[in-house]
Each structure stands twice: as structure tokens, then as C-alpha cells.
Amino acid sequence: MLTELEKALNSIIDVYHKYSLIKGNFHAVYRDDLKKLLETECPQYIRKKGADVWFKELDINTDGAVNFQEFLILVIKMGVAAHKKSHEESHKE
């Protein structure tokens, strides 16, 4: 039986593959597909930055695609923001 963390990790991998496989590559999410991913999977976290800004920030090796390791940067930043928001909401109560 998987732990909650293992389930969450599998979910992250599944989301990445959902968008990487649009163009048939397990290892690359391209600019237009990253935009779809951001708009669909994490709309509240892209308000301040557009998809093009995110793409430039995430495509560290400048190969024109976001690989899984680069994608994890987005996941970490979203996680930090969600954690911060959870504390802000708990202080409002």
C-alpha cells in the first residue's frame, strides 16, 4: 500500500506525463503544452507570471522544453506558496 507522499509523487509524475505525452515525449513539455499545464493544473499560481515567463524560468538548459527535473522547480515553488497560504488562512480563523 502506498503512503500519502508516495501517492502525491505518483500524481505529480502523472500530471507531467499527461502534458509531455501530448507531443509523444516522456521527457519534455514544450512551451505551448506548459501553458496548457499551467492554466489547467495550477491557475492560481500563474496569476503573477505568464506562461512565457514560467517557461524561461524553468527551461534551465535552454533546450526548448521543460524536462521533469525542471518541472520539479515549478512543483517546489507551488508547494512553498501553498504552504504559506495555508498558514495565512489558519491565522484568519
Swiss-Prot record:
Known tissue expression: Calprotectin (S100A8/9) is predominantly expressed in myeloid cells. Except for inflammatory conditions, the expression is restricted to a specific stage of myeloid differentiation since both proteins are expressed in circulating neutrophils and monocytes but are absent in normal tissue macrophages and lymphocytes. Under chronic inflammatory conditions, such as psoriasis and malignant disorders, also expressed in the epidermis.
UniProt keyword terms in alphabetical order: Antimicrobial, Apoptosis, Autophagy, Calcium, Cell membrane, Chemotaxis, Cytoplasm, Cytoskeleton, Immunity, Inflammatory response, Innate immunity, Membrane, Metal-binding, Repeat, S-nitrosylation, Secreted, Zinc
A Gene Ontology term for the protein's cellular component: cytoskeleton
Induction (record text): (Microbial infection) Expression is highly induced in CD14(+) monocytes, neutrophils, and developing neutrophils of patients infected by SARS-COV-2.
InterPro entries, per database record: EF-hand-dom_pair (IPR011992), EF_Hand_1_Ca_BS (IPR018247), EF_hand_dom (IPR002048), S100/CaBP7/8-like_CS (IPR001751), S100_Ca-bd_sub (IPR013787)
Residues annotated with S-nitrosocysteine modification: C42
Keyword Cell membrane part of the UniProt annotation: yes
Localization annotation: Secreted; Cytoplasm; Cytoplasm, Cytoskeleton; Cell membrane
Entry annotated with the keyword Kinase: no
Further remark: Binds two calcium ions per molecule with an affinity similar to that of the S100 proteins.
Function in brief: S100A8 is a calcium- and zinc-binding protein which plays a prominent role in the regulation of inflammatory processes and immune response. It can induce neutrophil chemotaxis and adhesion. Predominantly found as calprotectin (S100A8/A9) which has a wide plethora of intra- and extracellular functions. The intracellular functions include: facilitating leukocyte arachidonic acid trafficking and metabolism, modulation of the tubulin-dependent cytoskeleton during migration of phagocytes and activation of the neutrophilic NADPH-oxidase. (Microbial infection) Upon infection by human coronavirus SARS-CoV-2, may induce expansion of aberrant immature neutrophils in a TLR4-dependent manner.
Protein name: Protein S100-A8
Protein source organism: Homo sapiens
Encoding gene (name): S100A8
